[in-house]
C-alpha cells in the first residue's frame, strides 16, 4: 500500500471531469508542508472570492526528524514526494494551473532544506516556497 492511499480526506467536493467543464472561475491549489501533516486545499476562485472545494491531509512527522536530528531523512523525502505526487494528480483532476506550495518551520529549519526542495522540484515539478 502506498502512502498516497493513506491520505485523509477531510472535505471532498465533486471532481469528476472537473478539468473538462467550461466555467467562470478557476481552481487553485494551496499545499502546506507542515511539521506533522502535509495538507492540500483546492479552492474555487472567482470575482466573488474563494470557496474551498476539497481539503486533504496526510500525517508526516517532518518536525520530529528536524527537531531531533536537524535533517530530513531520505526516506521522509521519498514519502513526501509520493504524497505530493498524489496531490498533483488531484490538482490535475480539478484543472488547477496555479498553486502555492508553502513549507513551514520544520522544512525551513532543516540543514538539508536545499536538497529537499531540489528533490521536490526534480521529482514532482513543484516549487516550494
Residue ranges of model-derived segments:
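Nucleotide/phosphate-binding catalytic cleft detector across ATP-hydrolyzing
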Residues: 2-33, 41-129
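Primarily the dimerization/phosphotransfer
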Residues: 36
